[in-house]
Every structure is written in C-alpha cells, then in structure tokens.
C-alpha cells in the first residue's frame, strides 16, 4: 500500500443514473487526469505512478495528464522509470510543483512537457548530484563508484536538455544542494511559469 493511502483518505460520493458511487479522492482526481507524486520516490510509488500514466494514455492518448509533485526525492532508478514513461507515452504530461520538488522530484518536474511545467509561488525546488553509499570488496566499490558517476553524467545531460542551461552550468550548480524559489526555478529553466491562481 502506498504511504499516501495509509492515512485516512477522504471519499467523494457522486450521484449517477444508477444511484450513488463513492471514490477515494485520488481515484476521483485520476478521472480528471490528475496524478499525485508525493513523498519519497521509491519503487512501489513509481510503479503506481507509471501504471496511472499508462492507464490515462489508454483512456485518451490526446489529452494532457497533470502530475502534481510534492517530493523530497529518492531512488534514481525508481524516478527514471517515471521519467521514461512520461517521455514514452503520447499525452503531454504537465508537471506542477506544490510544496517541494527536490532531487529526483526536481528532475521529474523539469521533465514535464515544454511550456507546461509549473510551480506554485511558495514551493521550493532543489537540485544536486546523486547520492550513494557502498560497502564490500574494493573492486565492487570501484564498480559502484563508476556507476554513480555514469548516472550523474546522464542526469546532468538530461537536465541541461530540459533547462536549456549549458552542461558546465548544470555540473557546477548540482555539485552541492542548490535550493531555488519559484521565481528562481523559472529563471533557471526547471519550470516555465509560477502559478498563483487557477486559469493563469
């Protein structure tokens, strides 16, 4: 079960011609093509997000999907499964940061459809290089160290593509935790606009 469903989840009751039908709030919003990516990015959560993306594509391949992000980041491989699916499916995926989009959360935010990446005004965005820790034989540690450097270079290259920043700037700015306000995230190219009110 996803952590989002561990707490009490509100139910929405709809009147239909066949009587009443109740949905949990997230399932009801899924009908409106809204997906929530909240909390730590990990395999189970990523599988749920990927499944929802694929389902919404099958429902209507020409209508935008809205991915709301409030995440401190997490697993690179789990995040990349979401990212690759966002790029793979036919519908545009519009990303919206609410609260925070850090690390892999920021990467997914930037990976939304060009011109359709948004941030709410009091949200924070943070980019940095991937983290990892290893133990074991020296040769294995060396292999893992090389792998994390390969991942770092790949993430930097993709961030450069999505932001329009030179790769050298991305490498410098992700060397340490780099926090940005909503306006700074727009200026940097991680998102396209700050949304203060619906309809903007």
UniProtKB/Swiss-Prot annotation:
Which keywords are on file for this protein?
Answer: Cytoplasm, Hydrolase, Protease, Serine protease
Tell me the GO BP annotations in alphabetical order.
protein quality control for misfolded or incompletely synthesized proteins
Task: Indicate the segments annotated as coiled coil, or none if absent.
Answer: none
CDD domains named among the record's database cross-references: S14_ClpP_2
Entries under InterPro entries matching the protein:
ClpP (IPR001907), ClpP/crotonase-like_dom_sf (IPR029045), ClpP/TepA (IPR023562), ClpP_His_AS (IPR033135), ClpP_Ser_AS (IPR018215)
Q: Does the keyword Acyltransferase apply?
A: no
Active site annotation, chain numbering: 103, 128
EC number(s) per entry: 3.4.21.92
Q: Where in the cell is it found?
A: Cytoplasm
Q: Which GO terms describe its cellular component?
A: cytoplasm; endopeptidase Clp complex
PROSITE patterns membership: CLP_PROTEASE_HIS (PS00382), CLP_PROTEASE_SER (PS00381)
Q: Name the Gene Ontology molecular function terms of this record.
A: ATP-dependent peptidase activity; ATPase binding; serine-type endopeptidase activity
Top-rank lineage group of the source organism: Bacteria
Concerning Gene3D superfamilies, the annotation shows: 2-enoyl-CoA Hydratase, Chain A, domain 1
Q: What does this chain do? A: Cleaves peptides in various proteins in a process that requires ATP hydrolysis. Has a chymotrypsin-like activity. Plays a major role in the degradation of misfolded proteins.
What interactions and quaternary structure are annotated? Fourteen ClpP subunits assemble into 2 heptameric rings which stack back to back to give a disk-like structure with a central cavity, resembling the structure of eukaryotic proteasomes.
Report the family membership.
Belongs to the peptidase S14 family.
Which PANTHER family does UniProt cross-reference here? ATP-DEPENDENT CLP PROTEASE PROTEOLYTIC SUBUNIT (PTHR10381:SF70)
The entry's protein name is ATP-dependent Clp protease proteolytic subunit
The organism named in the record is Vibrio cholerae serotype O1 (strain ATCC 39315 / El Tor Inaba N16961)
Gene that this sequence comes from: clpP
